A protein has these predicted regions:
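A hydrophobic alpha-helical transmembrane-helix feature that marks the membrane cores
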Residues: 1-247
């Protein structure tokens, strides 16, 4: 007997929420894959057109700054811009990333470094995505720790860039070791971020599923797609560091 006459969600509501969560989670993954295919497509086009590669090489730092600007703008307008604008920014970022990633990948042997790094990325990403999707825990409590680790990685990276630029011999001698350590830390950080982001998408959709507001759900879907895309790309770059450092 329930003295307060309070009832939980009905079985049909639970089933409806689970269906919507599954649909929207798949939607985020689908948009992420479309973004990756856009990146690959631009990369292949760049390899087929030397003028594209030359442009990317000559303007590499500018393209990187534009990419950062797009991501910051996306984050700032994530809950105010219309969904089509967010999708446009997502595709723009994916396309620009095709140019920069192609240049980075060309530094490495395809069969000894790039392909093993890609296979490793798929394994880590899929494994931790499954963890994020199936766990009953809210993984957001892990965010401060991985953010702190990410901040540490960024600071160390800038210090090493400064060491090369100003020719600090003391630090420059450790560049390969630091790069390898950053690679391993990056794999851990972005694997955990993958689980956190999948878990966040699932929880966010669960909270608003019964509102039947397609705009909110579409927004959660594309925001989640960018997060997953960034996790995948950064995992790949981290594994490139590791495999590339060992060759």
């Amino acid at each position: 007997m329930n003295p307060y006459n309070v009832t939980g969600p009905s079985n049909s509501q639970v089933a409806q929420v689970e269906s919507i969560v599954s649909q929207r989670l798949k939607g985020s993954f689908l948009w992420m894959v479309v973004g990756l295919l856009t990146t690959i497509g631009v990369g292949v086009a760049a390899l087929a057109n030397p003028s594209w590669l030359r442009f990317a090489y000559q303007n590499f730092n500018i393209i990187l700054l534009v990419e950062l600007g797009v991501v910051f703008l996306f984050s700032a307008r994530a809950y105010t811009a219309n969904v089509m604008t967010l999708k446009g920014m997502f595709f723009l970022y994916s396309a620009l990333n095709g140019l920069t990633l192609t240049l980075i990948s060309l530094r490495y042997n395809v069969f000894e470094v790039v392909i093993p790094a890609l296979i490793g990325t798929l394994a880590f990403f899929i494994g931790f995505a499954i963890v994020g999707a199936t766990t009953k825990r809210n993984l957001s409590s892990l965010t401060p720790y991985v953010m702190a680790a990410l901040l540490g990685m960024i600071i160390v990276s800038f210090v090493m860039i400064g060491a090369r630029y100003f020719n600090w011999a003391v630090l420059s001698g450790f560049s390969d070791t630091v790069s390898l350590v950053l690679g391993y830390v990056g794999v851990v950080v972005f694997s955990i971020f993958t689980a956190i982001d999948v878990n966040r998408i699932k929880n966010n959709v669960t909270q608003v599923a019964l509102l039947e507001d397609e705009t909110i759900l579409d927004r959660i879907e594309i925001i989640g797609a960018l997060s997953l895309y960034l996790d995948f790309i950064n995992l790949f770059l981290s594994l490139l560091r590791i495999f590339g450092n060992k060759r």
